[in-house]
UniProtKB/Swiss-Prot annotation:
A motif ('KMSKS' region) lies at residues 261-265. It comes from Mycobacterium avium (strain 104). The keyword Oxidoreductase does not apply. One of its GO terms (molecular function) is cysteine-glucosaminylinositol ligase activity. This is L-cysteine:1D-myo-inositol 2-amino-2-deoxy-alpha-D-glucopyranoside ligase. It comes from the Bacteria. The keyword Zinc applies. It catalyses: 1D-myo-inositol 2-amino-2-deoxy-alpha-D-glucopyranoside + L-cysteine + ATP = 1D-myo-inositol 2-(L-cysteinylamino)-2-deoxy-alpha-D-glucopyranoside + AMP + diphosphate + H(+). Its EC number is 6.3.1.13. Binds 1 zinc ion per subunit. PANTHER family: CYSTEINE--TRNA LIGASE, CYTOPLASMIC (PTHR10890:SF3), CYSTEINYL-TRNA SYNTHETASE (PTHR10890). The gene is mshC. A motif ('ERGGDP' region) lies at residues 159-164.
Length: 384
């Protein structure tokens, strides 16, 4: 997960944020925890980190939930964003430098859409609502990020917010850039008519306007690989005339509960706020999520939480001792494992080994317990 240059240089990361229509669940927490670890690793290496995260504060799911609950969509978004930030702070997930709502970036979106229309990479679908679409074949490299074949792309496009059956499109995979205004929907003025942004172009516009080209990392959950991240990169590459939006594309695995992926549609969410409300310490939640590798799909359970709580207790007992075994090697190994694809299971195992030695055999290094606690805090974000 190294950045492009040495200590003191800038390291840049854009991570897709939430659509704020419901509370933060453990799937969200696991994703943002993964990028928090990268953030912390870069800071430890001495980089000046420019981390940007968006919030999709105008989108169909948000508008539908607001209509269902009889609440203004802006009030709903503001409420859920506030709760999300509260949960992230409780989990000690460092805030990005820039936290940007889609509604704050309308002018940037309009500028990108204008450029794509001018170059022929976008077109207007004739009809009652003149929506603007991006041509999936506008860049030769389209598809490199996901590596999916066309059949897989079409299936995921339909499942994840795309509209392959939309009449008038040149290609079923062409993605919405600008949704022309409909009655009862929020809209903004533009040279090509009132409307609102498509999902993917929001992120391209925010990333380019806040960071620019050549990101070190574009990141998010693995369910965003296609179509969202593929099209976000394609939009940016098309406008900038570049082959690659980011040096690395990083995706966190999904969190399941009771044998199924955790999702709003399934109704099996484990909410961070609910766990906190039950008195579960956020540090234990964090450790439970760190017990699995960030890229793998994994399951949350009461056993995972119990094991994390016990681990936290042992670590705190060991680091409260007046002395312990030398800490140099264990801290070096934690850094080494995190630098190797964020291998948190090995990092936690190394700390477990030091903890066992400290509790079972003691030690003579009076600085060691404090050094271990400081390293765990800085590198893993767990306060002991």
């Amino acid at each position: 997960m190294a950045a492009g240059a040495g200590p003191g240089s800038a390291a840049t990361m854009y991570v897709c944020g939430i659509t704020p229509y419901d509370a933060t669940h453990l799937g969200h927490a696991a994703t943002y925890l993964a990028f928090d670890l990268i953030y912390r690793q870069w800071l430890d290496l001495g980089h000046d980190v420019h981390y940007v995260q968006n919030v999709t504060d105008v989108d169909d799911p948000l508008l539908e939930r607001a209509a269902r609950d009889g609440i203004d969509w802006r009030a709903l978004a503001e409420r859920e964003v506030s709760l999300f930030r509260e949960d992230m702070a409780a989990l000690r997930i460092l805030a990005p430098r820039d936290y940007v709502g889609a509604t704050e970036a309308i002018a940037d979106v309009v500028e990108l859409v204008e450029k794509m229309l001018a170059s022929g990479a976008a077109y207007v679908v004739d009809g009652e609502f003149p929506d603007i679409y991006y041509r999936a074949d506008a860049t030769l490299q389209f598809g490199y990020e996901s590596g999916y074949d066309r059949e897989t792309m079409l299936r995921l496009f339909a499942e994840r917010g795309g509209d392959p059956q939309r009449p008038g499109k040149t290609d079923a995979l062409d993605a919405l850039l600008w949704r022309a205004a409909r009655p009862g929907e929020p809209s903004w003025p533009s040279p090509f008519g009132n409307g609102r942004p498509g999902w993917h172009v929001e992120c391209a516009a925010i990333a380019l306007s806040r960071i620019g080209s050549g990101l070190d990392i574009q990141g998010g959950g693995s369910d965003l690989i296609f179509p969202h991240h593929e099209f976000t990169a394609a939009h940016a590459e098309c406008v900038r005339g570049e082959r690659r939006f980011a040096r690395h594309y990083v995706h966190a695995g999904m969190i399941g509960w009771d044998g199924h992926k955790m999702s709003k549609s399934r109704g099996n969410l484990v909410l961070v706020s609910q766990l906190r409300g039950r008195g579960v310490e956020p540090a234990a939640i964090r450790l439970g999520l760190l017990a699995g590798h960030f890229r793998g799909d994994r399951y949350w359970s009461d056993q995972v939480l119990d094991e994390a709580t016990a681990r936290l207790r042992r670590w705190r007992t060991a680091t409260a001792l007046p002395a312990g075994p030398d800490a140099t090697d264990v801290i070096a190994r934690v850094r080494q494992y995190l630098a190797d694809d964020l291998n948190t299971p090995k990092a936690l195992a190394a700390l477990d080994g030091w903890t066992t030695d400290a509790l079972d055999y003691g030690g003579h290094d009076t600085a060691a317990p404090r050094l271990v606690a400081t390293a765990v805090d800085a590198l893993l974000g767990v306060a002991l």
